[in-house]
């Protein structure tokens, strides 16, 4: 009994599988389509929109219709020559003309300059009255004062630099004038501005014995040596830089060495030996002086 039932179940399963795998006839397909709704038949399998695209299109249409400043797409050509589409942000209008620069009349500039000299910051009611008198907006007056303050700061920086250069030049000229008049006897000598004279006691080793003998003080003026005249620019007087504007003063002083000869001989040998130019003067004149003394 159990075996017969099993055979019957297997036979039924085979028949059901055959009915499922058997294709339907055209008549059955037409009957099935007649029962389906018409909306389902209109949609084809390859024409489904991308997910979210319908919502985006609807949003774009509604926003573009309600907002005149809606973003727009334009085609641009990049550096490689390819054309691509970019989206301009909302509120950016390339067709809008640029704001023209405000041009002030001579009368307006004169009044603004006078007010700036009186007070550099005009705010509140004063700015309102001034803008009404000059037929300008408060923003234009405000921007003009801001630009004027910036310009004044730049001018003050340039004036301070020029003032420092002028003060250094005046101090150097006063020192040189005192040197020329003989009133200043203590500062170190300037090889570029004084005649090539040598003052001091020089010692040379004695070749005949281990001791040393002192040589006479040399007060004569040796011949002109080009190495003793370095350029006056760049040297220091009391740690003050000498600018290049003193070229005329140096030429005037060097053209009259006789007026400075007596004063320069009175300068102490201690300052001359401790001068900042000592390595230059001693290294150059030592060999020539030794040769003269040995002769």
Swiss-Prot record:
InterPro entries attached here?
EMX-VAX-Noto_Homeobox_TFs, HD, Homeobox_CS, Homeodomain-like_sf
Q: Which Gene3D superfamilies match?
A: Homeodomain-like
Disulfide bonds listed in the record: none
Is Repressor given among the entry's keywords?
no
CC per GO annotation: nucleus
Q: Extract the GO molecular function terms from the UniProt entry.
A: DNA-binding transcription factor activity, RNA polymerase II-specific; RNA polymerase II cis-regulatory region sequence-specific DNA binding
Principal location: nucleus
Gene Ontology biological process terms in this record: brain development; central nervous system development; neuron differentiation; regulation of transcription by RNA polymerase II
Q: Which family would the database say this protein is a member of? A: Belongs to the EMX homeobox family.
Q: What does this protein do?
A: May play a role in the specification and maintenance of basal forebrain identity.
Q: What is this protein called?
A: Ventral anterior homeobox 1a
